[in-house]
């Protein structure tokens, strides 16, 4: 009993007729006003080979036209989009989702068994409320931390871009900016992502995109608790303007008693202090790389104690050998610190040995009598800037040191070794 479009068969009651497709937000596009064409029994499903209603639309400006590739029955069996065949809940390939939920694909692949299985699944779908998937996926009740970490919560509209213009690659395209295809260099043909098959993606086998995501999941960073057992505070970043203290409390109260929640709206972050260390560790483990509040993915880290921050502040301007260096005098406050000072705050700038003499303090001398004092910092040319230390309100964010301040630099003791 065949149900394909090309065969002259009596069993046309199994052909699918739908009023609206099952699509993900990415394939539907960012434009809320789209024009969609509907072709009844337009093509055969690429999985079950049954005729179904084909929908075609343009998801946005300078995007390629998209259409449904599989029927709605095959889409409901796997809970995937009819166009991209990605999971509707997580936005991931079927192979990644089944690996995270420990599901095993049991769909038949031969024609006769496939038709019999499809008819049974259609009967099960008709008896359900339509809000939950059927089959093995509908019976899976456990959630996976890996899926929550890899899930794509926001649409990725770059996936709807046009294909690469083959004439432009050969240097023969004469349309210029009017060409509806992309004028970009194609990817490496040896790249596994360049060869994808829609049936392999549906059945969850040999999917290069899924293999890439599974490798990324195996190398994901972990949030280890600090050695200081007194730290019970978590840092939550990326709040935005919509997430409030009550939203954070509604999520974190399940892990234990919360002592305080401090929201820093200017920095779009919050500090959540728990009453016990055990509650903080459970909250960090359950929320790291998988915390989503009001549709926003939040960054969770461990807070730092006041003692640790005080030690870091004391180390500013001190070399690894313990030599205290004075800040460079005469720099106006408008100058930002050099990038190297920000990135390598604890580096040894001067290559000092482990033991060295204390630094020499440079004392600025007052100007000779009869000479007007130099203008204040920020006025006049740089050569006339004051050499003394600027006022406290004009200092740079951190102390800055030059290699010439190092007493062990090359040439500092040249006079001692010179011949008389």
From Swiss-Prot:
Residues 232-305 form the RRM domain. Its main location: nucleus. A zinc finger (C3H1-type) spans 159-186. Pfam families: RRM_1, STL11_N. GO terms for molecular function: pre-mRNA binding; U6 snRNA binding; zinc ion binding. InterPro entries: Cwc2/Slt11 (IPR039171), Nucleotide-bd_a/b_plait_sf (IPR012677), RBD_domain_sf (IPR035979), RRM_dom (IPR000504), STL11/RBM22-like_N (IPR048995), Znf_CCCH (IPR000571), Znf_CCCH_sf (IPR036855). The keyword Metal-binding applies. GO terms for biological process: cellular response to xenobiotic stimulus; mRNA cis splicing, via spliceosome; positive regulation of RNA splicing. CDD domains: RRM_RBM22. Residues 303-343, 372-420 are annotated as: Disordered. It is found in: Nucleus; Cytoplasm. Residues 309-318 have a biased composition (Basic and acidic residues). The keyword Zinc-finger applies. One of its GO terms (cellular component) is U2-type catalytic step 1 spliceosome. Keywords: Cytoplasm, Metal-binding, mRNA processing, mRNA splicing, Nucleus, RNA-binding, Spliceosome, Zinc, Zinc-finger. The C-terminal RRM domain and the zinc finger motif are necessary for RNA-binding. Required for pre-mRNA splicing as component of the activated spliceosome. Involved in the first step of pre-mRNA splicing. Binds directly to the internal stem-loop (ISL) domain of the U6 snRNA and to the pre-mRNA intron near the 5' splice site during the activation and catalytic phases of the spliceosome cycle. Belongs to the SLT11 family. Component of the pre-catalytic and catalytic spliceosome complexes. Component of the postcatalytic spliceosome P complex. This is Pre-mRNA-splicing factor RBM22.
